[in-house]
């Protein structure tokens, strides 16, 4: 068996990669993939076509003398080099490619810039670590010899420092554990060989367990964390030593009773083997139950520790007995004298004599310490795990000197909708949502497409737009006031035009009457002398002369009047040519044509020819010869007829119709002129009234723009045409996804992003944003958040859920195994209760030491791990103590308690000291979480060892008596070997127990 273990411990580690290498290959995810913050990060990355990497490195560039042009040249060079490193850099936020980021990435004092970089690989993976080292080298090489100082920090730097610290601390922790175990084992056994036996089993167990965990990680993909590696070493050292102490102590006890060494090994295995098996089962099953936790820190640590416990158990029941069998015949592991037996016997005697006092005193102390646990404030800031001298810690300190911590750790509010949000209504609803979020106490700024600078766009505020309209209305009102004289003149001119058109109508009527007479006369001439008729056919000269003379008089009278009335013709024609009323009225249009012909007749001399004809006719007298008159008249008539044809008077009927049309047109023109004048007057009056109204509206809108400029009063409106502008598209690129379905807002708070207040604020922001959804275009949108406070919120929520699971699984497993081991119900209940109060006392003491005296909050992961270890290890001691009580119960209640305390006090104390020493080795770590965990688990084991198992449980067992074993009767089923041991007790011991019993009765 020894050879098998040696071969296993040597060969197995050579067959698989080291556990440290597997920790790099399969790092622990902080949160499960379905965590809200993780889902939000992936959703935002997919929507904006970004890397979605949470592996962020922040480069801080400072120049305490002030950043200048030379510094910006170095910055430019660094950005170019990082962009060329596509293997390590997947994202870069700089203000060279995105100028609006200059304000965000630069400090207010003008002395520092930050450069966020997304590294390749998942956080904590070897790829991420190599990317970190390459980028760090580029940064240092670029700023070397310049006025800039570079610091690297951020999550990627913190994880890298934690990895380096874990590797650096592992050797010192294991060395410290080994030294303390050697010292304690030497004090306990005072035998070098016996002292080395637990170390041999621990060494073989540790090498085998680490190889097995690495193999499971290699084959099954089990994630391995630095915490798991450190705790695996500590748990194997503690549990393996406990199991060895249990077995060796019982072996020594049988040897003292005279058993042969080999027989003593057999009987020790039969006696304590079930306790070791029950203890290992309790711890192992509890650790396996942690596999169902959501947080990686629990779900990955649990299986690794369960493997370690299983290997330790197998080594304790196979390797250690084999070594004892080989070493015992030679006397190498012979027991030394029992120095502490008398002390523990007296301690048991005092307890059974005054069980209430001891129980009360122990409970008061435990409750007092446990009450301090209620003062605990948990830390979620991983930066505080590292010493201040680590590079990432130095970087954070330098960054906080120039930037607020919340400025460098942003949060994003993500709104995802099934439809495009790039609409006026969608943007207005988004602004309303952002406005509500910005009013939450503790929210310093909300940046987004509707508020790029943290405030609502002034140009998009409805009140601003109203003010602009008011200004323009005011200008229009002032223009109307200034043009009042022009309006009055317009009205006067319209009235004057109407009056003139009325006069024109009268003149046209008179002219038409004269022209009508002319037409009649000309028609008569045409009938009498036109056509095929000739003057040769006229046989009545006297009659002809008389008629000609009369016609001349008529023409003279009519055409003298017409000629005198044509002064108005030019103005009338000009008015008709520019009149829209005449354009729309056919009759007026016809009249206008006739007026044009009259104007033409006047201008080309046609009317003058008619007047000349009239005079010639009047001058016809009887003395003239008919031949002369006829010749002259013929020439004149031919000329007049040709001219009249140009006027359209060659057809008397058509001429009369046109004259009627002209008359009607003049009437319509005069009527329309009056209507226009009345309309102009009304328009002028209404325009003046409008000016008054515009002035009032302008005053109201300008007051709105000035007095209602606060965001809550301003309203929001983006005109559709703005959405197509290049400026809007440039701003929207950072906040709206290319398809327009996802919008994000950058949220900056006044709170420490690592505080519980910031975590609570996340829920408040989401609830407020969802409260702005009903009855808007965002009603069907999903709202989520991403960022470090959101991730910490999820960690806290999952932690609370996992703690409930861990507590339930641990308590149920411990109770069931204790019930199976003790075949009772009552004893397991108060034994588990004692373990729980021991755990709470350890947490309370940790709060006092770290939080009160050292000013450090407990890391959130410490209580969960401490609970599992303390309850499981406490169950080990419980099982050893309770099983011995049951086995010794044939002696009576008080005697069995004294006997049990005497026989197990030294064993439990030794085991407790050894386990506490192994946990105390964690105090040599440079990682704060490991130190806190080691201290709390260590002092918890000491409390359990020296108070709970030594005082509280024996006093409780004494008070309850046989009721502890209800419903069974263990005193009637005492183990045969234990009965033989009792029969071999010395007479002196029996006398002491009898005296104690008699004293108790009295």
Curated annotation (Swiss-Prot):
Determine the domain of life of the protein's source. Answer: Bacteria
Membrane topology according to the record: Multi-pass membrane protein
* Sequence intervals crossing the membrane: 1-21, 177-197, 199-219, 228-248, 268-288, 306-326, 358-378, 806-826, 835-855, 862-882, 901-921, 923-943
Q: Which UniProt keywords apply?
A: Cell inner membrane, Cell membrane, Lipid transport, Membrane, Transmembrane, Transmembrane helix, Transport
Q: What happens when the gene is disrupted?
A: Deletion mutant accumulates important amounts of DAT and is devoid of PAT. DAT only accumulates inside the cells and is not exported to the cell surface.
- List locations, semicolon-separated: Cell inner membrane
| GO BP of this protein | lipid transport
State a GO cellular component annotated for this protein.
cytosol
- Asked if the Swiss-Prot or TrEMBL record annotates the protein with the keyword Cell membrane, the reply is yes
Q: Which SUPFAM superfamilies match?
A: Multidrug efflux transporter AcrB transmembrane domain (SSF82866)
Pfam families noted in UniProt: MMPL (PF03176)
**NCBIfam families the record matches:** actII
Q: Which family does it belong to?
A: Belongs to the resistance-nodulation-cell division (RND) (TC 2.A.6) family. MmpL subfamily.
The UniProt function text for this chain reads: Required for the biosynthesis of polyacyltrehalose (PAT) and the transport of diacyltrehalose (DAT) and possibly PAT to the cell surface.
This protein's name: Acyltrehalose exporter MmpL10
Can you name the source organism?
Mycobacterium tuberculosis (strain ATCC 25618 / H37Rv)
Gene that produces this protein:
mmpL10
């Amino acid at each position: 068996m020894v050879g098998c273990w040696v071969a296993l411990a040597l060969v197995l580690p050579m067959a698989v990669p080291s556990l440290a290498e597997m920790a790099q290959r399969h790092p622990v995810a902080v949160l499960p993939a379905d965590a809200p913050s993780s889902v939000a990060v992936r959703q935002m990355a997919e929507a904006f076509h970004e890397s979605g990497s949470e592996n962020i490195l922040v480069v801080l560039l400072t120049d305490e003398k002030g950043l200048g042009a030379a510094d910006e040249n170095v910055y430019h060079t660094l950005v170019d080099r990082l962009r060329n490193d596509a293997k390590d850099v997947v994202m870069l936020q700089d203000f060279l490619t995105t100028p609006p980021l200059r304000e965000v990435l630069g400090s207010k004092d003008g002395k520092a810039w930050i450069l966020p970089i997304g590294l390749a690989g998942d956080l904590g993976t070897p790829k991420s670590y190599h990317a970190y080292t390459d980028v760090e080298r580029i940064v240092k090489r670029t700023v070397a010899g310049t006025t800039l100082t570079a610091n690297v920090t951020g999550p990627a730097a913190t994880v890298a420092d934690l990895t380096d610290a874990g590797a650096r601390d592992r050797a010192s922790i294991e060395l410290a554990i080994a030294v303390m175990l050697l010292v304690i084992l030497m004090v306990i056994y005072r035998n070098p060989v016996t002292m080395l036996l637990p170390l041999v089993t621990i060494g073989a167990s540790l090498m085998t367990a680490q190889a097995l965990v690495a193999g499971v990680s290699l084959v099954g993909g089990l994630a391995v964390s630095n915490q798991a590696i450190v705790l695996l070493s500590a748990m194997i050292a503690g549990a393996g030593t406990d199991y060895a102490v249990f077995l060796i102590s019982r072996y020594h006890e049988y040897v003292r009773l005279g058993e042969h060494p080999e027989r003593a090994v057999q009987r020790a295995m039969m006696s304590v083997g079930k306790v070791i098996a029950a203890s290992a089962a309790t711890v192992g099953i509890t650790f396996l139950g942690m596999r169902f936790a959501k947080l990686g820190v629990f779900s990955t640590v649990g299986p690794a520790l369960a493997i370690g416990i299983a290997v330790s158990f197998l080594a304790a029941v196979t390797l250690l007995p084999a070594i004892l069998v080989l070493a015992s015949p030679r006397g190498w592991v012979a027991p030394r004298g029992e120095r502490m037996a008398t002390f523990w016997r007296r301690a048991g005697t005092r307890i059974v004599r005054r069980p209430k006092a001891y129980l009360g005193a122990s409970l008061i102390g435990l409750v007092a310490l446990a009450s301090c646990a209620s003062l605990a404030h948990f830390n979620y800031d991983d930066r505080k795990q590292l010493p201040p001298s680590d590079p990432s810690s130095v970087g954070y300190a330098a960054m906080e000197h120039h930037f607020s911590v919340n400025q460098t750790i942003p949060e994003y509010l993500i709104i995802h909708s099934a439809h495009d949000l790039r609409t006026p209504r969608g943007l207005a609803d988004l602004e309303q949502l952002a406005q509500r979020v910005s009013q939450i106490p503790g929210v310093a700024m909300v940046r987004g497409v509707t508020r790029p600078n943290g405030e609502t766009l002034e140009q998009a505020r409805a009140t601003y737009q109203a003010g602009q309209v008011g200004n323009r209305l005011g200008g229009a009102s002032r223009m109307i006031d200034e043009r009042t004289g022009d309006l009055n003149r317009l009205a006067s001119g319209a009235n004057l035009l109407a009056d003139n058109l009325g006069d024109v109508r009268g003149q046209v009527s008179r002219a038409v009457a004269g022209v009508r007479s002319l037409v009649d006369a000309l028609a008569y001439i045409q009938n009498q002398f036109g056509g095929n008729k000739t003057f040769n056919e006229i046989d009545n000269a006297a009659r002809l002369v008389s008629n000609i003379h009369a016609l001349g008089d008529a023409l003279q009278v009519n055409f003298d009047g017409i000629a005198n009335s044509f002064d108005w013709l030019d103005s009338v024609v000009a008015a008709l040519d520019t009149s829209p009323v005449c354009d729309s009225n056919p009759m007026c249009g016809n009249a206008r044509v006739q007026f044009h012909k009259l104007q033409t007749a006047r201008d080309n001399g046609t009317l003058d020819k008619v007047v000349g004809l009239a005079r010639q006719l009047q001058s016809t007298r009887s003395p003239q010869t008919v031949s002369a008159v006829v010749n002259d008249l013929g020439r004149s008539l031919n000329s007049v007829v040709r001219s009249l044809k140009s006027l359209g008077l060659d057809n008397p009927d058509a001429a009369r119709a046109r004259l009627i049309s002209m008359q009607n047109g003049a009437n319509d023109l005069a009527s329309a002129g009056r209507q226009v004048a009345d309309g102009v007057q009304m328009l002028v009056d209404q325009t003046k009234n409008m000016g008054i109204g515009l002035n009032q509206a302008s005053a109201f809108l300008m007051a709105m723009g000035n007095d209602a400029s606060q965001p809550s009063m301003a309203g929001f409106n983006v005109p559709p045409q703005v959405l197509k502008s290049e400026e809007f598209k440039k701003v929207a690129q950072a906040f709206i996804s290319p398809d327009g379905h996802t919008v994000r807002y950058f949220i900056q708070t006044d709170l420490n992003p690592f505080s519980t207040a910031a975590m609570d604020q996340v829920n408040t922001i989401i609830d407020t944003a969802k409260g702005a959804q009903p009855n808007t275009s965002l009603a069907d949108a999903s709202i989520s958040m991403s960022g470090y406070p959101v991730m910490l919120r999820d960690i806290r929520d999952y932690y609370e859920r996992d703690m409930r699971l861990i507590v339930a699984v641990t308590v149920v497993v411990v109770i069931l195994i204790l019930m199976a081991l003790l075949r009772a119900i009552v004893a397991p209940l108060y034994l588990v209760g004692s373990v729980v109060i021991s755990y709470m006392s350890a947490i309370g003491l940790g709060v006092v030491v770290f939080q009160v005296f050292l000013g450090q909050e407990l890391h959130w992961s410490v209580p969960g791990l401490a609970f599992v270890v303390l309850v499981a290890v406490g169950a080990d001691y419980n099982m050893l103590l309770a099983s011995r009580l049951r086995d010794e119960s044939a002696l009576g209640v008080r005697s069995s308690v004294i006997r049990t305390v005497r026989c197990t006090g030294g064993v439990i104390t030794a085991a407790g000291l050894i386990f506490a020493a192994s946990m105390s080795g964690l105090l040599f770590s440079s990682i704060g979480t490991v130190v806190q965990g080691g201290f709390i688990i260590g002092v918890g084991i000491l409390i359990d060892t020296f108070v709970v198992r030594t005082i509280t449980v024996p006093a409780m067992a004494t008070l309850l008596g046989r009721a502890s074993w209800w419903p069974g009767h263990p005193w009637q089923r005492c183990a045969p070997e234990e009965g033989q041991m009792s029969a071999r007790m010395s007479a002196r011991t029996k006398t002491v127990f009898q005296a104690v019993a008699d004293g108790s009765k009295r």
